[in-house]
Amino acid sequence: GQDTIRKYTIKRLEKFKAKNDYGTEYKSVLCVISEYLYVQDLSEDIFSFEKMLAEISDKIIIVAESPGTFCELGAFVMDEQCRNKTIVINEDKEEYKNSFITKGPVKMLENRDEQSVILHNGLEWLKFSSVYDDLINKVANETLKIHINNDSKQIHLKSLIYELANIIEIFQPLEFFEIEKLYKKIKDFDNYEILNTEGHKIRSIKKVLVLMERIGLVKKDKGYYIINKKISCYNIMFTISRKEFNDVRIKYINRMDKYQPQRMEIL
């Protein structure tokens, strides 16, 4: 279909790659479109769901192009945690200058950080904009911030997602109960409590895996979870080199091939 500013921005961000020690390329940025992901199993309403997505995201980019996106912008800007991550791409029109959106949410973002607001005159203008180009590069090259979970009573959802992705990448393919068992064993947790669950229903690793599947971090095949091949999280929870990762992986695959050869068909 025809490019929109949102589609074009996603395409630009997803072009950024990172190489491992062996030259294999992986995506540096995983873009998620919130309204395509919402299901009632994960949250009672879309605003609570989007707030949860904001919690697990490094950046929130809102292309203000419809009443729905204006509502999102207002909701995110009113929440301090979300506001600090939000970037808005808004059309630069004379009639918008005194609008509620411009004087309210956009102004709040500008007061916090002028670089978090980009005003444009259409897609073709953006394609040649150095300001937009700088924004894309800044977002794509920003260091991922993850605080490893050490307290079973205060599990941060974002950290948990990457920790589980790390486990899956090393030991895939895995069933749900194996992932949970490995996580508890590695962490030495008897149980765990996920923080900030007031607005959503993600209180278990099983639900976290549903979310991870919907955002494209993992996929499920014949009941087994495997990592998205375009993404790598092997060194989130463990401080190991790629060689050490490969050594562990080869030993595990050889054992799996010997005792459960049917699993090899999933890879």
Where are these regions (language model features)?
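Short, aromatic/basic amphipathic alpha-helical patches
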Residues: 5-19, 98-111
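Conserved BB-loop
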Residues: 20-47
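Donor nucleotide-activated moiety binding/catalytic core segment of transferases
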Residues: 43-60
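Cross-kingdom TIR/SEFIR domain
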Residues: 75-118
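Long, low-complexity, charged/polar intrinsically disordered regions in eukaryotic proteins
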Residues: 104-156
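Short amphipathic alpha-helical interface segments
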Residues: 153-192
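A short, conserved structural fragment
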Residues: 209-223
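Short, amphipathic alpha-helical interaction segments positioned at domain boundaries
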Residues: 229-267
